[in-house]
A protein has these predicted regions:
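Glycine-rich phosphate-binding loop of actin/hexokinase-like ATP-binding domains
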Residues: 1-57
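ATP-binding/phosphotransfer module of carbohydrate and carboxylate kinases, centering on a glycine-rich
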Residues: 42-45, 50-178
Length: 178
C-alpha cells in the first residue's frame, strides 16, 4: 500500500503517515498530531493550550476517568468490560469512536489513504471500536472518500510502534549494517 495512516489510541492519540510508499514526517518532524485536532469548539482545555482537542474526548485517559468514578479502571479493564457487554463501557467507547471517526474524516478528505489502521491498547476490541469509528468517518468524510477508505484494527497490538520505529532505522540510508 502506498498511502496509509496508522493511528494509536492511548493516553494520547497520534498518527503515523505513509504517503507514496514512504514515511511522511512534515517540515518539523511532528506530523500526525491528530489528538490535537479540534473536535468541539468550546470543549475542555487541553494540555497543549487549545480547547476541544480529540484527546480531551477520546483518549484512554479520558475513558478511564469516565469509567473509574467508583474504582480505578485500566485499559485492560475497558477491553474486558466491553467484551463482556458492560453498557457504560460500550457507551463511552461508542462516543470516543465517533469522535475519532470525525477526526479521521479530515485526514481521509485531505490525503485519501487506502487504509487507516487503528492500534494501541484497545486493539483487542476489534469491531466494538471500529464500528463507531467507521460511523464517524462516514458521517464526516466526503462520501466517496469515506466509502473508499479501508479501516482495520492492527494485529500488532502494542508492538506496532516499536516495529515501525525499527523499520525506519533499518531503512535509513545512513545505517551501517554489520
Amino acid at each position: 500500500m502506498d498511502n496509509l495512516v496508522f493511528v494509536k489510541i492511548g493516553s494520547g492519540i497520534g498518527a503515523g503517515l505513509i504517503l507514496g510508499g514512504h514515511p511522511f514526517s512534515g517540515s518539523l518532524g511532528i506530523t500526525g498530531e491528530i489528538g490535537h485536532e479540534t473536535i468541539t469548539d468550546n470543549g475542555v482545555a487541553c494540555h497543549c493550550g487549545n480547547r476541544g482537542c480529540l484527546e480531551t474526548v477520546a483518549s484512554t485517559s479520558v475513558m478511564m476517568a469516565l469509567l473509574g468514578t467508583r474504582a480505578p479502571v485500566s485499559t485492560a479493564d475497558i477491553v474486558r468490560n466491553a467484551l463482556s457487554g458492560d453498557s457504560a463501557t460500550l457507551r463511552v467507547l461508542d462516543d470516543a469512536g465517533a469522535a475519532i471517526g470525525r477526526g479521521l474524516a479530515s485526514i481521509a478528505n485531505l490525503i485519501n489513504p487506502e487504509v487507516i489502521v487503528i492500534g494501541g491498547p484497545l486493539a483487542g476490541l476489534d469491531q466494538i471500536l471500529l464500528d463507531p469509528i467507521r460511523r464517524g468517518l462516514l458521517r464526516h468524510a466526503v462520501p466517496s472518500v469515506g466509502e473508499a477508505t479501508g479501516l482495520v484494527m492492527s494485529s500488532l497490538g502494542d508492538r506496532a510502534e516499536a516495529l515501525g520505529a525499527a523499520s525506519l532505522v533499518l531503512q535509513s540510508p545512513g545505517l551501517r549494517r554489520a
